[in-house]
């Protein structure tokens, strides 16, 4: 029973870290990264569609993203969606390809990005701690039902605390790496 609870907690914690890694990948780092387009959806034949499903995205140079729609009629819609987004990048449309030139990051922009990284990381840590709390609540519920002994509960609580500590250290390492990446560009 405890093992099942711990395994589910492990899965949830891994998913939390995966979400963090994806979110951090989508944060601008002064170089071209197709992940910055992941959250942008384009109105295409009446449906909101991710850019990645409408076009090939390549990186011809370190700070340039090239978006080549499979259907040329989607060019204007893609351009409009990028302009509406919070990317802060003006697309260059030559009728075939949309180019996004990623600007150099200013010191102020870097600090804002690092602040967002820290907030995102803190949200992930809160989620991990919430998973720990859920597990401890489940252990206490089992104790009330007299399904497990006090010793087993203590052992389970220690194990979930160890997992929590490991995942939080992992998140800290991921955040530190991303912060260094942003500040060293």
Swiss-Prot record:
Which compartments is it annotated to reside in? Cytoplasm
Q: Which GO terms describe its biological process?
A: translational termination
Q: What is this protein called?
A: Ribosome-recycling factor
Matching Gene3D superfamilies, A to Z?
3.30.1360.40, Ribosome-recycling factor (1.10.132.20)
What's this protein's function? Responsible for the release of ribosomes from messenger RNA at the termination of protein biosynthesis. May increase the efficiency of translation by recycling ribosomes from one round of translation to another.
The lineage is:
Bacteria, Bacillati, Bacillota, Clostridia, Eubacteriales
State a single Pfam family of this protein: RRF
Instruction: Pull one GO CC term from this UniProt entry.
Output: cytoplasm
* Stretches of the chain forming a coiled coil according to its record: none
- Note the InterPro entries from the entry: Ribosome_recyc_fac, Ribosome_recyc_fac_dom, RRF_sf
Alphabetic keyword roster: Cytoplasm, Protein biosynthesis
Gene that this polypeptide is encoded by: frr
GO MF term (any one): ribosomal large subunit binding
Q: Which family does it belong to?
A: Belongs to the RRF family.
